[in-house]
Every structure is written in C-alpha cells, then in structure tokens.
Amino acid sequence: MAPLNSQLRITGLGEEISALSNLPWEKPLEEWPEDPSLTAQRGISRHIVRLVRSTPDPESEIYAVKETVEEFATREYEALRELGLRGAPSVSQIAIVNGRLTPKGEELPCAIVTRFLPYSLPYRVVLSGDVTQHDITNMANALAYLLVRLHLLGFWWGDCSLSNTLFRRDADGFAAYLVDAETGEFQKNLSNGQREHDLELARFNVAAELEDLKLAGVLFPAMDPIRASESVITRYRKIWKALSEPQVLPANDRHAVERAMRSLQDIGFAVEEVDLQLAGDKSTLTFIPKLVAPNYHSLRLKELMGLETEEFQAKRILASFDRFRSREISRTPDKHEAAQRWLHEVFNKVVGSVPPDLQGRVEDAQLFHEILEHRWYLDRKSTRLNSSHSSVSRMPSSA
C-alpha cells in the first residue's frame, strides 16, 4: 500500500479512488508485479505501462497505469474525458496520480490511470496468431473508421498508430479504440491540412510497426507493410468521401435518395440531416450529407433490444432478427414484442448453449455471430457432401 504522505494526490472518478489508493504508488511502475495473464494484453508504449487489477479478485476491474509527465497526464485525462462525453471509441480516464515518493523520499513520475478495455487486444497479439490477408484488411479498415470518427468530432490525434490502438472482434472484422491521447487535441475547425497530417503519421507509423513484425518473423511472407499502411489511407478517403462529398442522382428515380442514405448506413453512419438541390433543368438531384452520426446499427439494436454491441455485430444481429420476423406465421405489428421473443427464443438459447467454463471469454454478441458462422459452415459442408453422394449414386455402374 502507498505510504500515507501529504504529497500523494489522486484526482479522478470518485467511485474508483478507494481501489486506486491500495496500489503500491511508492514503487517505480517497472517494479510493480503484473499478472502474467494480463501481460499478454498489454501493448508497447513509449512510456512504462502496467495492467493491474483493482482487487485480488480475478474478476475485478483492470486498470492501465502509465508513468508520464504531469502536463501530459493532465492533457490526456482531459482529452479522454471529452472523447468519452462525445461517444468516441476510446478508453476511459480514471485518475491522475502525482506527488509520488519512494520510502526514501525520492520523487517518482506522475501516473495516469485508464480503464482497460474488456475483450480487447493490442495489434501485436492479434497479428501473432494465424492471421490472413482478410484479417489485415479488416484491421486497416477498423483503424481508418476510428480516424474518421475522431476527425468528425474535430479531434486531431497527432500519433495515429497501431500501438496507440486496441482492437476488439466485431463480427467478421474488428473495432478499433483509441488508447493513447497524449498528443491529441480538439480543434474548433479541423482543417484539411490537419487531417492530412494525421494520415501521413498513420501511413508512416503503421508501415514501421508492421515492418518490425515482419523482421521479427511474425507476419506471413506475402504481407507488405507499406501496402497495408496505404490501405488504411485508401479506406479512410473512401469513407470520408462518402460522408462529405455531394452525389449527383437522377431526379426521376424516386429510390435514388433512399439508396444513397442506405449506402451510408451500410458503413455504419446514420444521415441525420441532408441537403438536396434540384438542377435547373430538373434532370438531377445533388445529395449532400450535412450531419452524419456513427453507430447506425448498434444504436438501432440498443433501442430495440437493449443490447450493447459493436457496429457490425449489431448489423448481424439485426439481420438475424429480420429473418426471424419474416418466418413468423402470425406477425405481430409490435416490433419490440417480436424483439423480446427473438431474444428469448434465439439469442439467449444460442449464447446459453456454451458450456459454463467457456462463458465470459468472448462478448455475447460476438459469440452469437461465431456460433451462427460455424453452423452456416457445417450446413454448407453437409450440403456439399449430400450433393456429392447424390451424384455418385446416379453414376452408371460401369463408372
């Protein structure tokens, strides 16, 4: 336990302070013991970082503690708080700890404490497994999507990289979360130049990080770090263009505007305000998104069923629910009643089929997706086998 001295000061969320006060603040962070099961979940950082539990209970809250300069800690704490208030995908701030002293009275660095993101992993852990080009593409897409969301909020990251990001499984892909906001700041009007600066930093950092893994023999041989980093930029530009640039639509197609809005919904954005301009000859419409909001599918799912999920997990669940409703013989007009039946008859049964000793290792929404994917694979395999057996049975005896 930290020594009771007049200089130690912990500033942060009130409900967390009591747990933090029991941590060994009188020791340099590099001397803190760390649960081996947590070490693998910690990424690399320019600072010393440790993952610790709030209590000895293995199910207790996990904190990430980072030693840094007080000025940087304060700036990052404020940035994370504002990001959280604006609904950005980022870790949440817990406290700033300063006035640390060793038992001999020597000063120790300031520390910032954040809440570790459950079910997340650093990129080095994700890429050290059996990954495919598809996985790399999905990680690049997730990082690009994260950067788009931050820029829509007017946040200049200043150090976009894989190291400063945590990844969670999101159906077939990944969701990316900002984990280090030390260099970031909000702008009243984020300029194109500032966006381009973030993109250049992302291009350089991602290529360098993947090159390190390639030299370490972790990446598969066909992996090109520079090409992978470029894919982040390409995906970012594609999303940003879809969200901000005008689309010219045929005025005589009454479904054109609906399709334009659906194309944005498919990538996870709701169109809350749009500007439509009719050409002078009335032959075309110009569709201009004016206000877009992320998490289109996950917000719909939360409102309908109360489930909190990642965006593309929600998209998969909503598709399953739509199929469920389409098969109902007596279809109730109340969508919320049908949603509760689906939760009871489908979702809870699928998730509940997992053995107790395996529960909790994966988010329920991700587990639901993976079980359905496995069932689809088995059904497809069975169909192919039956088709092969049928073909063999129809062969002439002389074959």
Q: Residue locations for each model-derived region?
A:
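Short acidic-glycine loop/turn motifs at beta-strand connectors
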Residues: 56, 169-172
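C-terminal catalytic region of ATP-dependent kinase domains
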Residues: 175, 180-376
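Short, low-complexity Ser/Thr-rich regulatory SLiMs
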Residues: 100, 167-169
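Short, glycine/acidic-enriched loop or turn micro-motifs at the edges of active sites
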Residues: 118, 162, 183
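Conserved ATP-binding subdomain of kinase catalytic cores across diverse folds
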Residues: 20-133, 137, 142-157, 313-382, ...
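Hydrophobic residue at the +6 position relative to the catalytic HRD Asp in the kinase catalytic loop
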Residues: 160, 165-167
